[in-house]
Structure formats: C-alpha cells, structure tokens
C-alpha cells in the first residue's frame, strides 16, 4: 500500500505556534533616556532631562558615577538604564538606587535580559512569554520608515524581558524618545505577530551612533 506522506524522519519540523492572542498583541515601545534630552514623566508630561545636579548616581560600593538632576535620576530609575552626556551608560544594579556602568564596547546600546545580551535599536523587543533569541515577524512594522530614514522589514528579536507588562505583549526598543514620539503615530497599539525565522537587519546610521556618543 503506497502513501504520499513523507517518512517521519524526513518531515520538516513543525514550527512552534504562538498563542492566539498574538494575532492582536499589545505593542509598546521603550527607549534610553539621555541626559539633556527631552523625555516624559510617568504621567506623560513633557520634561527635559536637565537642571540642578542634586542627585548622585552611585554603584553598589557607594562610589559616585555622576551627579545628575532629579528628572534624569528618576527616568534612569524608571527605564532601568540611561545615557550620560559624557557617553557613560548606566544600568540599575542590585536595587533602584544603585547603578553599574555598562561596557559599551560589548553592549553599546545597553543590556538585554542578561549581561551578555546587548540591545539593538529597532531590532530588540522585550517579551515575557517568548524565548530569548527568538525572531518574530510584526506585520504592521514591515515597510515602516524609521526616524533615521531606514525602512523596517518587520523582523524583530527577543533580547529582553519586561517587568511591567503581561503576556502577549512586545515592547519595542526604539533607542530614543524622539523616535518613540514619531513611531507612536505610525505603529498601532495592537499588532499581528507571527513566529518566523526571519532576517534581522541593522538600522544604525552614523547619526544614530553620534546620538549614542559612539562616534
């Protein structure tokens, strides 16, 4: 008796399927607050990250990393990371009042879910229910012109975890607050996400490197 079915050993592996809620997943964005830049408070009010340097960024040993203003300090706490004008990047350490300096040679745009995972602008996403390193395709992101002029192909990679949201949500790393302000008008709050081994592209330009104090 003949059969058209392929032998089990030769069949292509089945792709892991996403939960059905990913057909209408929540899509948010996060960025690195930079000292001196415009940003916003937890309530959505516009602020500029400057002012009297009344707060001290310290490491877990009590050593001073930098003096900053109140707004900058609070944004660094809220986002868990921050960029100083002098090019130093800090990340929250053991608690909300201690910071560590990020090794920018290894992770120039910040840390992901682990110390050896670096974030990549407009590629990295945070998720609470997808595996780190997994790539997914976001339909509504495909073809979007990014603030730096490059066009996105819809492919993103899970490099981070989120502590403030639930499952079936992607938090998109857009690097800059100004990029967020532009993209929030283009990308909807709910998107269609498909599990796919897609190719992530680089969207970093010389202008982006200059903003990140990497030039």
Report the location of each language-model feature.
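Fungal secretory targeting signals
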Residues: 1-13
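Solvent-exposed, well-ordered loop and adjacent helix/strand elements within mature globular domains
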Residues: 11-215
């Amino acid at each position: 008796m003949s059969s058209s079915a392929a032998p089990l050993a030769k069949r292509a592996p089945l792709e892991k399927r996403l939960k059905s809620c990913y057909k209408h997943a929540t899509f948010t964005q996060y960025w690195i607050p930079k000292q001196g830049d415009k940003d916003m408070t937890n309530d959505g009010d516009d602020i500029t990250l400057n002012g009297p340097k009344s707060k001290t960024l310290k490491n877990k040993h009590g050593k001073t990393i930098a003096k900053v203003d109140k707004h900058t300090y609070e944004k660094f706490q809220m986002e868990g990371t921050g960029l100083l004008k002098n090019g130093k990047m800090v990340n929250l350490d053991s608690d909300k009042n201690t910071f560590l300096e990020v090794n920018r040679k290894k992770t120039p745009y910040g840390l992901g879910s682990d110390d050896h995972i670096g974030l990549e602008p407009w590629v990295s996403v945070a998720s609470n229910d997808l595996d780190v390193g997994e790539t997914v395709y976001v339909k509504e992101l495909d073809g979007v012109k990014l603030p730096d002029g490059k066009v996105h192909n819809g492919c993103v990679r899970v490099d981070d975890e989120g502590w403030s949201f639930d499952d079936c949500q992607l938090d998109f790393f857009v690097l800059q607050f100004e990029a967020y302000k532009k993209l929030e008008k283009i990308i909807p709050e709910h998107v269609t996400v498909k599990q796919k081994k897609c190719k992530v592209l680089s969207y970093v330009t010389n202008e982006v490197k200059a903003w990140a104090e990497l030039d």
